[in-house]
Amino acid sequence: MAAYNKADLERRMKGAVESLKSDFSGLRTGRASTSLLDPVTVDVYGANMPLNQVATVSVPEPRMITVQVWDKSNVTPVDKAIRSAGLGLNPVVDGQMLRLPIPDLTEERRKELAKLVGQYSEKARIAVRNVRRDGNDQIKQDEKKNEISEDEKKRFENEVQKLTDKTIADIDALAVHKEKEILGK
């Protein structure tokens, strides 16, 4: 039985795309979204915890995020964590509720975010190419062990290349869409 596993390669390439989507969800586009605060961790109870484990995050208006902190003693650490997350948000504390007005993006900030989109998508492309290399290495090993013929080797390599091309096209489409969203085009 050959060790080349197309399903495993597909799963790993899909994982790179999902990771990219997750990275993109943290980029601010000028509209309020709860996913904007996903990367925020709060130092409470002697540990770093995700924000959604110490508060309820919601979007009551298109340009406002509210964070309802469950424990009053955590309001200050949550405020500090959001301010230091580098998201350009300044919470307004109102009891146990933090209101985060979403400011308009400056042209400079939009360009920075567009650059980040490029970096994130390149990281995903590299991950996909590494998966392709692993697949091709496995195919070559299978051929050396005489588990597959020369024709099968070529067919499998073509399968891997088609899968790679399709996945990279998906990544490029996601990047173009996110860039347009950020630049407001």
From Swiss-Prot:
Pfam families named in the record: RRF (PF01765)
Stored SUPFAM superfamilies: Ribosome recycling factor, RRF (SSF55194)
Keyword terms: Cytoplasm, Protein biosynthesis
Subcellular location: Cytoplasm
A single GO cellular-component term on record: cytosol
GO annotation terms (biological process): cytoplasmic translational termination
Chief location bin: cytoplasm
GO molecular function, a single term: ribosomal large subunit binding
Family, as annotated: Belongs to the RRF family.
NCBIfam families the record matches: frr (TIGR00496)
The protein's role, per its UniProt record: Responsible for the release of ribosomes from messenger RNA at the termination of protein biosynthesis. May increase the efficiency of translation by recycling ribosomes from one round of translation to another.
Protein name: Ribosome-recycling factor
Organism: Zymomonas mobilis subsp. mobilis (strain ATCC 31821 / ZM4 / CP4)
Species lineage: Bacteria, Pseudomonadati, Pseudomonadota, Alphaproteobacteria, Sphingomonadales
